[in-house]
């Protein structure tokens, strides 16, 4: 089993550097006095989570389920992994569908995310996944509801990939992939004294990490992932430009993601001089965004933010992210998939009393 073709070719010989400073170091990276004072609340959080886990009865989707998630608060790079896994499945004869909660949307119902769906209706990541994979994507607070709707509209779907949802225990799963960014597990404490959503290590099928392996590692196989920027960017006017061309002049960059400093560092790694940067809250809608530079300075953003930014600045250049995973990971995934027989049984009926708040 070979690694699937990369989603977009990377610029040569441009490895990702350590993330650029994006403000003060997170207090979750050390066990300082403030975090120690919050530690008792972490123990309460642990007890409540354990109680929640005990009362769950996982509901089966009727087809195999892969969950791509993390155990830390904030972004860890789950969505690019989801995109890569879905592409792999499509290339190997599966017909995958994607479900997500749709973080950042203003709606609360279960609905399909289409390539042109506004982010405020379906969330940033689901719309991006619909555009980049072509797979059907449904969002719902309870992911089993999204599974039911997806399979009703696309009955040929024979495997589900959940973008996030490692803690959504109401949905039974066959494969779990846990993703870490460069911060690893931080100070190793649970919320609010640390970044962990649940105790780590925990059983998963595989761990994927950027930077150094998270410590402690756990018993699951671990694989390093590499992220690079695609060699070309595109704007809302349908135009494309080579990143090497953008490197010939200072640019303005904006990002409304969990770790904007990482995006800015990747631009700098390509030799692109940054005249100004703006870090907005994750999932920000750009309604009040104003430029710091003149309109003759190119404006760059992430692919996730592009559709929202284009409403006011269609000339902004969206820079796609490319993810590469080692061949050993794809071999492991192939072995795990070989254990699963594509089925087409109806999903279990949703009982609202069995579904938790995650």
Give the role of each language-model region.
Residues 1-23, 91-92, 166-358:
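ATP-dependent carboxylate-amine ligase
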Residues 15-64, 356:
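A transmembrane-helix-recognition feature enriched in membrane-embedded lipid enzymes
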Residues 44, 79, 129, 163, ...:
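Residue-level signal for inorganic ion chemistry
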Residues 50-115, 355-356:
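Walker A (P-loop) phosphate-binding motif
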Residues 75, 146-149, 262-263, 308-309:
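Phosphate- and divalent-cation-binding pockets in alpha/beta enzyme and binding domains
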Residues 84, 88, 163, 266:
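Rossmann-fold NAD(P)-dependent oxidoreductase module
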Residues 102-218:
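Phosphate/Mg2+-binding loops and adjacent switch elements
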């Amino acid at each position: 089993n070979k690694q699937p073709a990369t989603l977009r070719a990377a610029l040569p010989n441009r490895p990702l550097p350590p993330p650029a400073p994006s403000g003060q170091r997170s207090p979750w990276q050390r066990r300082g006095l403030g975090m120690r004072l919050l530690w008792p609340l972490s123990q309460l959080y642990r007890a409540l989570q354990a109680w929640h886990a005990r009362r769950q009865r996982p509901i089966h989707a009727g087809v195999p389920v892969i969950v791509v998630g993390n155990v830390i608060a904030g972004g860890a790079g789950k969505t690019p992994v989801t995109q890569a896994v879905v592409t792999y499945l499509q290339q190997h004869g599966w017909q995958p569908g994607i479900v997500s909660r749709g973080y950042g949307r203003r709606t609360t119902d279960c609905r399909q995310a289409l390539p042109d769906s506004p982010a405020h209706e379906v969330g940033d990541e689901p719309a991006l996944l619909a555009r980049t994979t072509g797979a059907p994507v449904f969002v719902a607070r309870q992911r089993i509801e999204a599974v039911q709707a997806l399979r009703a509209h696309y009955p040929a779907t024979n495997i589900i990939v959940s973008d996030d949802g490692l803690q959504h225990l109401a949905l039974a799963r066959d494969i779990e992939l846990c993703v870490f960014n460069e911060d690893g597990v931080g100070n190793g404490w649970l919320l609010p004294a640390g970044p962990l959503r649940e105790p780590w290590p925990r059983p998963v099928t595989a761990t994927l990490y950027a930077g150094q392996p998270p410590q402690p590692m756990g018993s699951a196989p671990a694989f390093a992932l590499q992220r690079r920027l695609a060699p070309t960017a595109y704007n809302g006017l349908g135009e494309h430009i080579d990143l090497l061309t953008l490197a010939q002049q200072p640019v303005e960059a904006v990002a409304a993601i969990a770790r904007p400093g990482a995006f800015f560092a990747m631009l700098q790694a390509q030799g692109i001089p940054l005249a100004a940067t703006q870090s907005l809250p994750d999932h920000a809608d750009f309604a009040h965004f104003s430029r710091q530079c003149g309109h003759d300075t190119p404006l760059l953003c992430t692919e996730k933010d592009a559709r929202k930014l284009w409403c006011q600045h269609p000339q902004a250049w969206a820079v796609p992210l490319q993810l590469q995973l080692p061949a050993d990971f794809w071999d492991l995934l192939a072995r795990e998939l070989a254990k699963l027989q594509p089925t087409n049984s109806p999903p279990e009926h949703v009982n609202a009393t069995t579904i938790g708040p995650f």
